[in-house]
């Protein structure tokens, strides 16, 4: 899975995807590493197109030109936000591909292996970077859809804040994310020790 991240120095693109994410919180001050998405929506159209173009080049090498693409799009979009998605989907580098827009909750359900046609009802929860989407799907239709502006990034920051408050230790959000994932494994009842490195 490729991260939707981009690293830039001024107007020059340094890295895209996982390579850019590896630089997150490690790059010098003159290199900016961020995501073109914010709260589940496209925040920077130009950077999103660059990220997509980079990913498409990798996919074309594996699957060949002319593959089918599906865009998972949110339901609660404004006219301007819809225009951004359509502009990205109709970019010139995608013209050789078949591109379909799919409602994000439906795409989530398919990815989880939910049988949409023979389904009495399923609740789908998608925790994104800055938002969480709750959906109830039955008979292939979305009955309820609700989004809140809290996601994984806020959880990471909360973990960092708790470590700082309790142990007077400053850690980065990537370390906070790793701790969050360990603590979130509810099925694992074994206590596990974790070494955390930070700044006192």
Cite the ranges covered by each PLM segment.
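Conserved Rossmann-like nucleotide-cofactor binding loop
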Residues: 130
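Nucleotide/phosphate-binding catalytic cleft detector across ATP-hydrolyzing
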Residues: 1-127, 135-200
């Amino acid at each position: 899975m490729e991260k939707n991240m981009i690293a830039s120095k001024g107007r020059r693109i340094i890295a895209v995807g996982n390579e850019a994410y590896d630089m997150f919180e490690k790059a010098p001050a003159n290199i900016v590493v961020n995501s073109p998405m914010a709260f589940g929506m496209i925040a920077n159209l130009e950077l999103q197109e660059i990220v997509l173009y980079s990913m498409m080049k990798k996919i074309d090498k594996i699957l060949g030109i002319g593959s089918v693409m599906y865009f998972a799009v949110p339901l609660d979009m404004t006219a301007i936000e819809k225009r951004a998605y359509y502009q990205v989907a109709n970019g010139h580098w995608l013209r050789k591909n078949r591109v379909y827009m799919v409602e994000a909750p439906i795409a989530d359900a398919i990815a989880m292996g939910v049988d949409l046609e023979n389904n009495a009802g399923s609740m789908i929860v998608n925790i994104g970077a800055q938002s969480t989407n709750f959906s109830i799907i039955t008979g292939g239709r979305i009955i309820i859809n609700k989004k809140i502006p809290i996601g994984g990034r806020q959880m990471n920051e909360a973990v960092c804040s708790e470590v700082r408050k309790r142990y007077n230790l400053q850690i980065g959000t990537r370390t906070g994310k790793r701790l969050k994932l360990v603590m979130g494994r509810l099925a694992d009842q074994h206590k596990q020790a974790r070494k955390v490195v930070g700044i006192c």
